[in-house]
Amino acid sequence: MATTSHVEHELLSKLIDELKVKANSDPEADVLAGRLLHRLKAESVTHTVAEYLEVFSDKFYDEEFFQMHRDELETRVSAFAQSPAYERIVSSGYLSALRYYDTYLYVGRSGKQESVQHFYMRLAGFCASTTCLYAGLRAALQRARPEIESDMEVFDYYFEHLTSQTVCCSTPFMRFAGVENSTLASCILTTPDLSSEWDVTQALYRHLGRYLFQRAGVGVGVTGAGQDGKHISLLMRMINSHVEYHNYGCKRPVSVAAYMEPWHSQIFKFLETKLPENHERCPGIFTGLFVPELFFKLFRDTPWSDWYLFDPKDAGDLERLYGEEFEREYYRLVTAGKFCGRVSIKSLMFSIVNCAVKAGSPFILLKEACNAHFWRDLQGEAMNAANLCAEVLQPSRKSVATCNLANICLPRCLVNAPLAVRAQRADTQGDELLLALPRLSVTLPGEGAVGDGFSLARLRDATQCATFVVACSILQGSPTYDSRDMASMGLGVQGLADVFADLGWQYTDPPSRSLNKEIFEHMYFTALCTSSLIGLHTRKIFPGFKQSKYAGGWFHWHDWAGTDLSIPREIWSRLSERIVRDGLFNSQFIALMPTSGCAQVTGCSDAFYPFYANASTKVTNKEEALRPNRSFWRHVRLDDREALNLVGGRVSCLPEALRQRYLRFQTAFDYNQEDLIQMSRDRAPFVDQSQSHSLFLREEDAARASTLANLLVRSYELGLKTIMYYCRIEKAADLGVMECKASAALSVPREEQNERSPAEQMPPRPMEPAQVAGPVDIMSKGPGEGPGGWCVPGGLEVCYKYRQLFSEDDLLETDGFTERACESCQ
């Protein structure tokens, strides 16, 4: 292996610095900068398997597999280093290379890092050794892939999928798979008892700190907080301090999302904790709301009606109920006078929209949809907390819940497309149900397509492998026995926008909508098939299966009216019979997470979102790097580059003739958001957990509260579980859509995980001082009795120090509001 001299090192560094700043306008410069960075790092990485084992063997939980197959591994790794797959990896641009060395490659003694080749060897070796350790898991793999016999053929199976990047793993898996005593779960959910000061202390110092130490994103339910008479802001600041401590000097920042229901007496103070003008804000954490459908029904039908607030100690069973049972309990408590305050429901919506526009959150989930579509009945123990990215849903009161994530790189499933990976076997053996399905999507490519279509066979192969990868991480890397036994899996995707563009379609074209549903139906079907095989051969069926809806022949899509299936119902029925007979290893299957971290490695678009920008920046641990849309620049004609560079790649700013040529590369901000919501609804029947559905608004649209409020109502009407993950705002003054650094006042998550750490996902830019009207807190005891004891008959109390208006013609206008200072502002 060639090494670099001091002079060469300096020269390479200067060349990289010169080239990387051109990445958004010169794709060749981006590729060259990435290749040079790999060359620059060659001196500090391991070169042979023998050297790798010498440096890292004391870190492995199973060194024996690597030692036993050392020579064979050297052969595989050497062949990979000369392969087209490796060439694609090192040619994926500067940000991809930076991400490897900055985050994913394991560091050993004396600062020696594993090489990219050995990184993939470690991941595949972990999966292979785990598969060989569990005889049932190996038997299931051989049932799915009968051609696999020897240990090294098991290794090859995982190695080929990982190095071809058809299967991409979460950040915890990529960083710690194979490392002794590591937790590989991406998400941790907990709803602790917060009813007393002692309970809060236990929850924070005994449990939360441990979860953050394990470098996982955490979702915490805080609806039960405040019963001890303390302000919720105190609890939020304590959580924020925990996060900031654990993130100091850390390669992979983590965070916490705190979830509350909107009937809580301190809901306004809860929302306030993220507002940039709040000098005690909590920039390191995120807020989320589990909103009952009653709230949306009242806002839509009678927006001036009262919304009642309750102290959690007087709220009866509100926290544990949903649907009609929740409504009955809510009105029973109101009739009994148990409420401690009331506010116009418009006023509360004002505050929610205000916070979303200025801080990007709260994340908003529909309580009924999350609970009613779960695999068992949750009435009386309803979920009211999700994970850090609002796509993983599990009950978490009785024990901590976890989820292991992976995702499929959809562009690798294109037929004859550049960078596509061809299947290496004939589909004549394996799971008979999967073999009965079509190999290609019937949706035909459009004009300008670079591929001949989308390969459903490759998608199913990748989904099957991802299910085995997640099974390995569950069996060897779960933090508790309870979470391991539940075997919650979340399979997502990246590069959906790339697929549509490569097939010649705009994101919301009819063919895109058709393939959108088809992809997730086949993923859900394949994950169920594979999980059933694993359960049969390992004899590990998740607890509660016999009481689950699956045991009665149920599928998640049964609960969604009007679901069109591309897989014949006869084949679904055969799968149902198999599951009823053999059970399931996993309790959950599909969760569409943000994939910012691993999408940077592959150079694909993030998750299932439309393109965020064609030329943007990304903040890493060490620098702010340019991030070009590689699919876009691959399709740009040479004679169009200058015009596109002038507008930062923004298609909407081009002259009409040129704009028409590149319409399929419009950004998420250019599309009608209701169309994007509808596409989320189309795939929802096959997403048994949830999807991190974000909204993308232009600044002029976000300046009207009605825009965002109407979109939230529309998502509710369509029954989405996650109504809104982020609210992202495109600044009107920007000539190019740029993902900028968060200001000192704001900190927005970064994403991993396949991930989740919203510490990599940059927040929407804050708007100028709040664009929303509404009270910060209204705790009235009766009609017209305000926070300071003053009365405004027939009006709604608003502290003028917090009153900031939308346009006068806004749906959420402020007619009838009366201004005066509340007691705390006088």
From Swiss-Prot:
A molecular-function term among this protein's GO annotations: ribonucleoside-diphosphate reductase activity, thioredoxin disulfide as acceptor
Keyword Nucleotide-binding in annotation: yes
Marked site positions, Interacts with thioredoxin/glutaredoxin: C822, C825
Catalytic function, reaction form: a 2'-deoxyribonucleoside 5'-diphosphate + [thioredoxin]-disulfide + H2O = a ribonucleoside 5'-diphosphate + [thioredoxin]-dithiol
Stretches with biased composition (Basic and acidic residues): 749-758
Role, per record: Ribonucleoside-diphosphate reductase holoenzyme provides the precursors necessary for viral DNA synthesis. Allows virus growth in non-dividing cells, as well as reactivation from latency in infected hosts. Catalyzes the biosynthesis of deoxyribonucleotides from the corresponding ribonucleotides.
Protein name: Ribonucleoside-diphosphate reductase large subunit
Source organism of the structure: Epstein-Barr virus (strain B95-8) (HHV-4)
Designated gene of the protein: RIR1
